[in-house]
Amino acid sequence: MNVIRARTAGFCMGVSLALRKLDREVDRAEEKAAQGSPRCRIATFGPIIHNPQVLEAYAGMGVRCLRQVDEVEAGDHVVIRAHGVPQQQEKALRSRDAVVVDATCPKVKKAQLGIEEQCRAGRTLLLFGEAEHPEVRGLLSYAGEGALVFGSVDELEGLPLQPETEYFLAAQTTQDRVAFEAARAWLHERLGHEVPVLETICDATRLRQQEAIDIARKVDAMVVVGGFDSGNTRRLADVAAAQGVFTVHVENESQLPVEQLRGCGIIGLTAGASTPKSIIDATQRFLESL
């Protein structure tokens, strides 16, 4: 079996940075314990990234995943997830007498601050994203009242837009660029003028999606590896499938539909921004063995 592997597959800068920050806290805690000091409790606030194998590995190291601010105890070392958190939660965390380490992706942090600046200037946010995604909840916390979220042009068409309101358009950092541009064009037609755009889709997302499209057009099937909770991985599968090729999204090689793939001559392989290289490697080896 021939496999074309995407060069962009695997950890993005934001994920790598977040994991390095968490690793640093784990290492420091172990060093202190080795010196006879009490081992401080290490935790993340929410899953550090959306990958089950990575989360399981950290749990094995004693890293807890906290969901509520009142779970944080004095002296804890708490690492904020790569997706960011609502600013009210961040303020509450910092009031708990704990050591708080912000591992928010720099691209997400830039989007948060850009949204805040636009809203302070009197504009209202139209946000293209998944309403229940943790990154989106964080972004909305910087937008004030009146912000609207939509996940597709169909949803955008159903929003109660007011002609007299000065809107601006932004997106979840891992959203589909083509769909975002379609929303932008629809707004121009609907409102009769160009809506200001805050460019928040990161380059890594754009390049990863474009490479997935390019590979999907050359192969008999496409395999996308990454957590089922990972929005950017789901969108990779979507853009690949949109090219008309059989596409499967799996978390690891054990979930591959072997019989459906066995007859393929060439298979494309890509992975989400939170998928470890070891899992991508294992999936590639398995595919090549078919």
Curated annotation (Swiss-Prot):
GO BP, one annotated term: dimethylallyl diphosphate biosynthetic process
Cofactor details (free text): Binds 1 [4Fe-4S] cluster per subunit.
Pfam families: LYTB
Annotated positions binding dimethylallyl diphosphate: H50, H83, H133, S230, N232, S274
PANTHER family hit by this protein: 4-HYDROXY-3-METHYLBUT-2-ENYL DIPHOSPHATE REDUCTASE
Family annotation (NCBIfam families): ispH_lytB
Species: Nitratidesulfovibrio vulgaris (strain DP4)
Its EC number(s): 1.17.7.4
A molecular function GO annotation: metal ion binding
Annotated residues for binding of (2E)-4-hydroxy-3-methylbut-2-enyl diphosphate: H50, H83, H133, T173, S230, N232, S274
HAMAP family assigned: IspH (MF_00191)
Protein name per its UniProtKB record: 4-hydroxy-3-methylbut-2-enyl diphosphate reductase
